[in-house]
């Protein structure tokens, strides 16, 4: 039996694409193992899938000054030795890396063990982890056509992003039932990313009366961001984080407000959900979400509101515009030729398996 080690972590966006590949890889006869961080979000998600999980030391890679920049390289080095030992013992035929700081030691360790590595970059420009890992990769899968020029060494392959099959098979009635909605108001789904967004949470709750006058709200607000005072608010259902329920909640929604991570926007495109994107600002990120959002806005798939312009008035104006023009966005998304990347990526994995 062929064996693959997968890696990726830090946020759900570095894990869920891996899950999308699992059923197809199993169908192709691969035994799957996973290397991730000790305390990252990926551990719980992967172990729940029944996949053997190997935790390693990992340091965060930062583009800014922080005292931890002096200690974290030693954590990465420790992670390389741990990953090298795991890889030597498990003897995988190939490694698949989805990005996130935990993947750098795994990719280096695979290279030292002469194991081929396929990486995947979701955003238009590569994150720091993938930039550091690229020299040790055999191929780097990319989601956007614009990304090819940003990957050095002629290693880029345009594959699209992998989307979980079950996400496309949600049940609208189950989603509505889960939220306890009793009327026929359109449903607005708000996603702040797997770690939540205090800015989005705050402005939504500040304008709750206004929004609830037109919509029922499903609010996925992130860990420790629930508001107990809103538990029994009619038309408002809040969740810290959802996994199995997400397909049903997506199916039930008519509009979506979201950050602009590549994975989630491609899921919205696949589901043809009219969406308002609020990308992370340049101040609090490397600007990848701004580029992602601009690409989708240019294609007519999304409406965009910059975080710096996020105010009560602008939020309501954009939301109303999106709802009034929802069919225009649905039609634009219906014309998209973007593929689900599962088949493209698994074909590449097959090709380079030792």
From Swiss-Prot:
Q: How does it sit in the membrane?
A: Peripheral membrane protein
In the Enzyme Commission scheme, what number(s) does this protein have? 2.4.1.227
| Residues binding UDP-N-acetyl-alpha-D-glucosamine | 11-13, 164, 194, 289
- Has keyword Chaperone? no
Pathway named in the protein's UniProt entry: Cell wall biogenesis; peptidoglycan biosynthesis
Q: Which GO terms describe its cellular component?
A: plasma membrane
SUPFAM superfamilies assigned to the protein according to its UniProt record, in alphabetical order: UDP-Glycosyltransferase/glycogen phosphorylase
* BP term (GO), one: cell division
GO MF annotations, alphabetized: UDP-N-acetyl-D-glucosamine:N-acetylmuramoyl-L-alanyl-D-glutamyl-meso-2,6-diaminopimelyl-D-alanyl-D-alanine-diphosphoundecaprenol 4-beta-N-acetylglucosaminlytransferase activity; undecaprenyldiphospho-muramoylpentapeptide beta-N-acetylglucosaminyltransferase activity
Q: Could you list the residue ranges forming a coiled coil in this record?
A: none
Per the record, the similarity remark reads: Belongs to the glycosyltransferase 28 family. MurG subfamily.
Q: So what does this one do?
A: Cell wall formation. Catalyzes the transfer of a GlcNAc subunit on undecaprenyl-pyrophosphoryl-MurNAc-pentapeptide (lipid intermediate I) to form undecaprenyl-pyrophosphoryl-MurNAc-(pentapeptide)GlcNAc (lipid intermediate II).
Q: What is the protein name given in its UniProt record?
A: UDP-N-acetylglucosamine--N-acetylmuramyl-(pentapeptide) pyrophosphoryl-undecaprenol N-acetylglucosamine transferase
Q: Which gene encodes it?
A: murG
């Amino acid at each position: 039996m062929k064996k693959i080690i997968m890696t990726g972590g830090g946020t759900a966006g570095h894990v869920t694409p891996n899950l999308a590949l699992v059923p197809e890889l199993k169908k192709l006869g691969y035994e799957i193992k996973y290397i991730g961080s000790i305390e990252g979000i990926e551990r719980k998600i992967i172990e729940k899938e029944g996949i053997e999980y190997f935790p390693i030391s990992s340091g965060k890679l930062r583009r800014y000054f922080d005292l931890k920049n002096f200690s974290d390289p030693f954590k990465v080095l420790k992670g390389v030795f741990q990953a090298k030992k795991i890889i030597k013992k498990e003897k995988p035929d190939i490694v698949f890396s989805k990005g996130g700081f935990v993947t750098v030691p795994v990719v280096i360790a695979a290279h030292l063990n002469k194991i081929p590595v396929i990486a995947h970059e979701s955003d238009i420009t590569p994150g720091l982890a993938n930039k550091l890992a690229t020299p040790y990769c055999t191929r780097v899968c990319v989601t956007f056509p614009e990304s090819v020029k940003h990957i050095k060494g002629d290693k880029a392959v345009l594959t699209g992003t992998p989307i979980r099959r079950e996400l496309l098979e949600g049940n609208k009635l189950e989603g509505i039932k889960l939220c306890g909605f009793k009327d026929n108001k359109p449903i607005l789904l708000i996603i702040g990313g797997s770690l939540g967004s205090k800015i989005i949470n705050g402005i939504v709750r500040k304008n709750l009366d206004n929004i609830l006058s037109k919509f029922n709200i499903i609010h996925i607000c992130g860990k420790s961001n629930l508001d107990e005072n809103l538990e029994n608010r009619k038309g408002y259902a809040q969740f810290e984080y959802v996994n199995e329920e997400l397909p049903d909640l997506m199916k039930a929604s008519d509009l979506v407000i979201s950050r602009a991570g590549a994975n989630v926007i491609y899921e919205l495109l696949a589901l043809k959900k009219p969406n308002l994107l609020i990308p992370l600002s340049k101040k609090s990120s490397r600007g990848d979400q701004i580029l992602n959002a601009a690409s989708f806005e240019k294609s007519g798939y999304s409406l965009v509101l910059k975080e710096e312009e996020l105010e009560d008035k602008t939020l309501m104006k954009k939301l109303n515009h999106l709802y009034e023009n929802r069919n225009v966005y649905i039609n634009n998304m219906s014309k998209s030729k973007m593929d689900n990347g599962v088949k493209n990526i698994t074909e590449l994995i097959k090709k380079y398996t030792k």
